[in-house]
Amino acid sequence: MLKEVRPAVVSLLALTMITGLAYPLAVTGLATVLFPYQAQGSLVERGGKVVGSALIGQEFKGDEYFHGRPSATVAPDPADSSKTVSAPYNAANSGGSNLGPTSKALADRLSEDVAKLKAENPAAAIPVDLVTTSGSGLDPDISPEGALFQVPRVAKARGVPEEQIRKLVGASINQPLGGVLGEPRVNVLKLNLALDAAAPR
């Protein structure tokens, strides 16, 4: 009996050591050496202080900043732990809203967001990413069209010409990887930091 079981036990222990310890440590070590910025969470600093991650969306309030996509993240309801409440940009609980196309709550939120954006820039078509949430609820990027839509509001709030802000948006566009993978996008955190540097409030 022991003769038959021994190979299985040895294999289990060997594979546990290889896949559970050696491989993760090797990959973590290589990542830290080859890609230190990414391995540490793609943290973005300003003045030596971490202000966010380039991979996680965060909320920017006020007309003087570019705003990201709506967030669908939630948190436990303090009054009833079996329920959740809206908690935008809650990085501890990433996930979509799971609201379907027939959901009244989704329709109401979309109507409210569209009305707010139409009031902000009545002449322009509203880019879809400014009213839809991402699968994670924490998308750090918006489309170039989403950023350009917000230029008049930001320029007015900062008291600078729109053309200056448009150039800043143009310089902040990340192109698809290799020209084919992904879509052109603008990282909202990095754009707002560049905005603060170029046109202080």
Curated annotation (Swiss-Prot):
A GO term for molecular function: ATP binding
TM regions (residue ranges): 12-34
Coiled coil start-end: none
Record bears the keyword Ion transport: yes
Residue numbers spanned by region Disordered: 73-102
Record's keyword terms, sorted: ATP-binding, Cell inner membrane, Cell membrane, Ion transport, Membrane, Nucleotide-binding, Potassium, Potassium transport, Transmembrane, Transmembrane helix, Transport
Alphabetized InterPro entries for the sequence: KdpC
Recorded GO CC terms: plasma membrane
Amino acid composition bias (Polar residues), ranges on this chain: 81-101
Bilayer topology annotation: Single-pass membrane protein
Subcellular locations according to the entry: Cell inner membrane
First-listed, main subcellular location of the protein, grouped into a coarse class: membrane
HAMAP family: KdpC
Family: Belongs to the KdpC family.
Self-association state and partner proteins as the record states: The system is composed of three essential subunits: KdpA, KdpB and KdpC.
Function noted in UniProt: Part of the high-affinity ATP-driven potassium transport (or Kdp) system, which catalyzes the hydrolysis of ATP coupled with the electrogenic transport of potassium into the cytoplasm. This subunit acts as a catalytic chaperone that increases the ATP-binding affinity of the ATP-hydrolyzing subunit KdpB by the formation of a transient KdpB/KdpC/ATP ternary complex.
Protein name: Potassium-transporting ATPase KdpC subunit
Organism: Rhodopseudomonas palustris (strain ATCC BAA-98 / CGA009)
Gene behind this protein: kdpC
